[in-house]
């Protein structure tokens, strides 16, 4: 995921448990996975319970002081916040902590940039990165200059991202034009598909649930399978022959995740249209994951937000072999169980 010889960033993860959220601990575990996938090593974690996220500094004053001490004690080079930071929060944190400050969105975009292989994928990722960056140049300039590279600085193909506001807006315009052409091409393909009356099933699910594995098993598609987050970004469509000489098309789509960046959803519209236009959704669930019920909820909500809620859906539980050890876990006596 990162260049050989490149020094790993030593980061502290920061999260806020609000009164309305109850998944902060699991979200921070996921953020650790994201950070490692992007090429960082987590050296510490800090969490604060608050009524709401602090509008100016994300964390409250006392927790910020604690974070400063942790940065020094653990020799950390940066902080990753578990929520998308506003431009004000990013700028204030950078000045307060005097280190590189990142957020969940920046890390996810960085991973997407490293994973993008096709020209369409690269256009979509770079557009999302630049839209995110354009609103945060003041804080990011100082923050990124501290290390000069690493998470948040790389575009698709290890291309260094632009920092000049005028050039960023010019590049965004170019990418939007290119994406319009891509979208027209996709619409043409879908139109031809509609005329053929072949039904389409889109494989959806949380990242690393096993969507590509299912596609490969059913169609021998040869799509990359890896036990990591966002192993594949670009949709792959293959024909599947059914009994009775029927045929359908199966499409593997990009995985979802909690707190999916808005800019990413907007930029990947042409790709996510595959979900909206499908006749059937095949929802792959990693049943072995301890948080699988929350992952199902995240996917369902994302699908609804995309305008695909209410479509016929088939749920496929994957990794059932890894789940059997959990089926017979005895509850604790204090939970009211009897022996």
Give short role names for the model-derived ranges.
Residues 1-110:
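N-terminal accessory targeting/assembly segments
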Residues 5-6, 72-73, 241-243, 249, ...:
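Conserved catalytic network of the ASCE P-loop NTPase/AAA+ motor domain
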Residues 20, 55-56, 222, 254-264, ...:
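Flexible beta-alpha connector loops of hexameric P-loop NTPases
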Residues 44-46, 280-283, 309-319:
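Conserved beta-strand/loop subsegment of P-loop NTPase cores
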Residues 131-199:
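P-loop NTPase nucleotide-binding/switch module
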Residues 181-251:
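Conserved G1/Walker A P-loop phosphate-binding module
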Residues 267-288:
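Inter-motif core of Ras-like GTPase G domains
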Residues 328-335:
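Conserved small/polar residues in nucleotide/adenosyl-binding loops
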């Amino acid at each position: 995921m990162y260049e050989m010889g490149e020094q790993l960033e030593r980061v502290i993860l920061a999260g806020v448990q609000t009164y309305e959220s109850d998944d902060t601990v699991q979200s921070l575990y996921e953020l650790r996975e994201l950070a490692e996938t992007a090429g960082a090593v987590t050296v510490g974690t800090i969490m604060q319970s608050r009524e709401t996220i602090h509008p100016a500094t994300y964390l409250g004053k006392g927790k910020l002081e604690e974070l400063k001490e942790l940065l020094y004690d653990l020799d950390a080079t940066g902080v990753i916040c578990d929520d998308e930071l506003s431009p004000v929060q990013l700028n204030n944190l950078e000045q307060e902590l005097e280190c590189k400050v990142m957020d969940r969105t920046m890390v996810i975009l960085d991973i997407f940039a490293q994973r993008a292989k096709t020209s369409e994928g690269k256009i979509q990722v770079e557009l999302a990165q630049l839209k995110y960056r354009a609103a945060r140049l003041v804080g990011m300039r100082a923050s990124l200059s501290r290390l000069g590279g690493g998470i948040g600085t790389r575009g698709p193909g290890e291309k260094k991202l632009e920092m000049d506001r005028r050039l960023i807006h010019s590049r965004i315009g170019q990418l939007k034009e290119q994406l319009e052409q891509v979208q027209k091409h996709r619409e043409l393909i879908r139109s031809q598909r509609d005329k053929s009356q072949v039904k389409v099933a889109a494989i959806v699910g949380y990242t690393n649930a096993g969507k590509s594995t299912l596609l490969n098993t059913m169609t021998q598609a040869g799509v990359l399978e890896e036990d990591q987050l966002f192993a594949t970004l670009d949709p792959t469509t293959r024909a599947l022959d059914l009994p009775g000489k029927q045929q359908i098309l199966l499409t593997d789509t990009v995985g979802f995740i909690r707190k999916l960046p808005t800019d990413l959803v907007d930029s990947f519209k042409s790709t996510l249209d595959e979900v909206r236009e499908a006749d059937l959704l095949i929802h792959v669930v990693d049943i072995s994951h301890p948080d699988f019920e929350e992952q199902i909820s995240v996917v369902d909500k994302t699908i609804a937000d995309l305008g695909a809620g209410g479509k016929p859906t088939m749920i496929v539980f994957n990794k059932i072999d890894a789940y059997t050890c959990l089926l017979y876990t005895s509850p604790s006596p204090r939970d009211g169980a009897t022996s």
